[in-house]
Amino acid sequence: MKSAVETLNPTRVRLSIEVPFEELKDSLDAAYKKINQQVTVKGFRKGKIPARVIDQRFGRGAVLEEAVNDALPKFYTEAVNEGELNVLGQPEVDITELKDGELLAFTAEVDVRPEIEIPDYSGIEVTVDALEVTDEEVEKAVEQLRERFAATNPVERAAADGDVVTIDLQAKVDGEVLEDGVADGVSYTIGSGELLDGIDEAVTGLEAGGEATFTSQLKGGSAEGKDAEVTVKVTAVAARELPELDDDFAQMASEFDTLEELKADSRKRLETTKQYDQATQAQERVLEELLKLAEVPIPEKLLADEVQTRKHNLEHHQLGQMGLDLEKYLEIQGKTLEEFENETSEQAIKGIKTQFILDELVNKEKLNVNQEELTEHLMRRAASSGMSPDQFAQAVVEGGQVPMLVGEVARGKALAVVVEAAKVVDTNGEVVDLEDDEEAAEAAAETTEAPAEAAAEDKAEDKKAEEKNEA
């Protein structure tokens, strides 16, 4: 076999491959054997038909076609390895010459990873939010905890903001009561905004037994998006009573003996959360600067596939779980289809660039992934997918996507290398030490997925859906 590589552009090549006919012998033998098992000829046992009879009865062309189809992948792979090419996706193959007994010649055009020169990233400087926890934030956190321990007591008065009312609901569209538009005994906190628009105004001021009618656009169900005439009847009113903020509350709501200890713990938790957010912010901003420094050509077909994958994931997984279609989603977001497609394309370009650069950095820095790192990463991904580690691991293995997980961890480590070399300061001008924030680095790297990663997510989500249906 002879092969030659022609570079069409930085991301696409054409392979020209010539195969002497004697190198097709194994494929020709396999073709005769396959046809032998598929056909019957009177006078011959199945599988024992001579080659000359097959040629006479079914044509030499059918045999050659079968042999070529068998041989192409093998010779294409040999040519790719010989040319030391890092190919992306499937090739477009064109058979240019096929002379029986003499020669098979074909070309294969395929996308390849572009050669990328890693820029000097040591001079990157970024600014992040300062790690500050205010007294107001601590008070808010404690107040939220206090809300969780609120008690409700029945009252004989008109309902007011913050009260918990028990209500019966009936929705009509065009004068007809909807089959799924009746609900009794619903508990609702006035002012929470958790039900229909207009319900707060309707129930405020009503006592138990009181009734009101209002018009509201339905947020779900069989008549989603339509205006409905909603009748609400209050059957009970209860006032929420918050516990006193004192040491007794601290002992009831936590493992601490005093309110001051509870507040100190709340402050510490807020600091930890902000520390993680600060690290993630640093990685995102360092990554943005790195992308600005590097020239990364994007293969057109890879970009088109990635855009399609992102659209598919949004429509069939994320929106499907929320009961929305793309049209409704865009309406809620206030975006046109053109704006959505432009944004999706920009996100895809960023994702591909990020993967190319970080993968190149992994090779340059010779970064490896050990079993412990891979296991920890798998458990985090499983949790984010709402699956058990065993379920997620099975889906990944069945989809042949273990290398995808390894790549994610490696890219996270590569990004951490860039962040470590960068100068990160907060809005107060203080240098930020991001040492040991590897988990946040991985999280930032995972926000940019190439098609392989997105495909694995599809498989994991499909697996989860199948198990749910079987249950």
Swiss-Prot record:
Residues 432-441 have a biased composition (Acidic residues). Residues 456-471 have a biased composition (Basic and acidic residues). Its main location: cytoplasm. Its EC number is 5.2.1.8. It holds the Pfam family Trigger_C. One of its GO terms (cellular component) is cytoplasm. It is an enzyme of class 5 (isomerase). Keywords: Cell cycle, Cell division, Chaperone, Cytoplasm, Isomerase, Rotamase. PROSITE patterns: FKBP_PPIASE. One of its GO terms (biological process) is protein transport. Residues 442-454 have a biased composition (Low complexity). Residues 162-243 form the PPIase FKBP-type domain. Residues 431-471 are annotated as: Disordered. It catalyses: [protein]-peptidylproline (omega=180) = [protein]-peptidylproline (omega=0). It is found in: Cytoplasm. GO terms for molecular function: peptidyl-prolyl cis-trans isomerase activity; protein folding chaperone; ribosome binding. It comes from the Bacteria. Belongs to the FKBP-type PPIase family. Tig subfamily. PANTHER family: TRIGGER FACTOR CHAPERONE AND PEPTIDYL-PROLYL CIS/TRANS ISOMERASE, TRIGGER FACTOR-LIKE PROTEIN TIG, CHLOROPLASTIC. Consists of 3 domains; the N-terminus binds the ribosome, the middle domain has PPIase activity, while the C-terminus has intrinsic chaperone activity on its own. Involved in protein export. Acts as a chaperone by maintaining the newly synthesized protein in an open conformation. Functions as a peptidyl-prolyl cis-trans isomerase. This is Trigger factor. It comes from Streptomyces griseus subsp. griseus (strain JCM 4626 / CBS 651.72 / NBRC 13350 / KCC S-0626 / ISP 5235).
